[in-house]
Each structure stands twice: as structure tokens, then as C-alpha cells.
């Protein structure tokens, strides 16, 4: 694991649920890659999670990764809460099922492939990486909204 990748992620949703987009900006050495996508009906949390998941999935080899997110839900979920969810068979302490368990499980499987540091950054502030990820997420959301408009 000799390569270090810095990733900025964000999600955007119009309504909750509603059309949403996700975006990620990856930096490796002197190279940057932008990725984004959308879902026609989703939530802001699912888009935040999908941005991180898709960014991790495109890494070709085991890496040291810093992921910057403005989602406390994502950061706390993957670093703190997930351990109890796994022990409780994907249920919370009140026995209610964990929301977005499908995505949490996919993210958890990525943890074994990389050394990941999850870092929170204030959203819509002066962090250029977060601003770029937000623009990508908004682009995804706008794509979803255009498709829905065409579908009538």
C-alpha cells in the first residue's frame, strides 16, 4: 500500500426522497479524476454514501485513502456506528433495521481493501475539494431532474 489517494465526496437531493446526484473528486499524485452519477428517486444520505462507494470502487489497487465528506452521517456511520450494527445483525439498539444497510454493507466491504481515513469538512464553505464535489453532485441531480421532466 504505497499510493495515497485523496477523495472529496458529496451528495445532492431535490426533496428527500427525490431526484439526487453524487459526485467525487479523486487526487492521486499529479492526477485528478471527477466522477458523478444520479438516481431518479433517492435520499441525500444515500447519495453521500454512493459518492464514497463509487470513488472507492474505481481504485485499482490497495491504497491509503483520505476521504473528505461534509456528511456527519457518513463519517460517524462508517467509523463509529457500523461496529454495533454488525454485532446487532444490521439493527440499531432499539432493534429497528438500519437505514441504507445495503450501502453500509458495500462500504464496509471496501474497508478491507484500503487503509481509509474518514475526515469531515464543513460543507458549502471554502474547501475547494468539497466545492468541486458539490458541483459534481449537483450536476448528477440536475441530470436526474431533466430525465424525470422528459418522462413526464
Swiss-Prot record:
Q: What does this protein do?
A: Endonuclease that specifically degrades the RNA of RNA-DNA hybrids.
Record SUPFAM superfamilies:
Ribonuclease H-like
Could you tell me what the cofactor note in this record states? Binds 1 Mg(2+) ion per subunit. May bind a second metal ion at a regulatory site, or after substrate binding.
Enumerate the PANTHER family for this protein.
RIBONUCLEASE H1
Species of provenance: Rickettsia prowazekii (strain Madrid E)
One GO cellular component this record assigns the protein to is: cytoplasm
Record note on quaternary structure: Monomer.
Top-level EC class as recorded in UniProt: hydrolase
Name this protein carries in UniProt: Ribonuclease HI
Amino acid at each position: 500500500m504505497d499510493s495515497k489517494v485523496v477523495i472529496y465526496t458529496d451528495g445532492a437531493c431535490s426533496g428527500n426522497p427525490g431526484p439526487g446526484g453524487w459526485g467525487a473528486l479523486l487526487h492521486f499524485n499529479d492526477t485528478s479524476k471527477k466522477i458523478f452519477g444520479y438516481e431518479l428517486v433517492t435520499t441525500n444520505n444515500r447519495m453521500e454514501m454512493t459518492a464514497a462507494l463509487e470513488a472507492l470502487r474505481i481504485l485499482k489497487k490497495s491504497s491509503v485513502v483520505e476521504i473528505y465528506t461534509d456528511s456527519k452521517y457518513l463519517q460517524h456511520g462508517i467509523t463509529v456506528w457500523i461496529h454495533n450494527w454488525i454485532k446487532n445483525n444490521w439493527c440499531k439498539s432499539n432493534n429497528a433495521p438500519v437505514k441504507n444497510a445495503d450501502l453500509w454493507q458495500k462500504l464496509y466491504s471496501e474497508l478491507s481493501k484500503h487503509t481509509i481515513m474518514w475526515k469531515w469538512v464543513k460543507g458549502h464553505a471554502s474547501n475547494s475539494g468539497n466545492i468541486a464535489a458539490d458541483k459534481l453532485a449537483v450536476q448528477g441531480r440536475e441530470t436526474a431532474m431533466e430525465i424525470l421532466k422528459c418522462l413526464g
